[in-house]
């Protein structure tokens, strides 16, 4: 009988943990959704840049955001302590990582930015550039200052 109780207890714990995992609601967003809360980018990025948190806590690991800048916009040279996985949703964006050739992103294209890699970008004239970015660690952005910029 003791073995039977162990099996039942284990099954109950498994089912309860499955229910707990499913308690977080699924979600889907377009960058045009009115319910998104857009906030400012770090101060070193010119006015016009906005970020909307889609999922997670920016102070913790595994946060997803939309990053939006208007057309004809320069994103200054910077780096992150976290790696970032990106998909361009709108616009045309040229991204240049230090020591590598520039990559011209079109909607639907994926890009990976390693942690600590310095990079800058230019959104082409026309549509705003909207990037979906999945950060592995807490979100930050450090400007590259001085002659190395």
What annotation goes with each model-predicted range?
Residues 63-80, 114-115:
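Conserved short histidine dyad/triad with adjacent acidic residue
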Residues 70-73, 80-98:
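Glycine- and acidic-residue-biased ligand/ion/polar-headgroup-sensing regions
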Residues 1-9:
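Bacterial N-terminal signal peptides that target proteins for export
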Residues 17-19:
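N-terminal signal peptide c-region/cleavage motif recognized by signal peptidases
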Residues 27-30, 120-149:
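Double-stranded beta-helix
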Residues 75-77, 95-96, 113, 118-125:
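Short beta-strand His + acidic residue motifs that chelate non-heme Fe in jelly-roll/DSBH
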Residues 99-116:
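Short acidic-glycine-tyrosine-enriched beta hairpin
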Residues 22-63, 146-149:
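A short, N-terminal "cap"/entry segment at the start of jelly-roll beta-barrel domains
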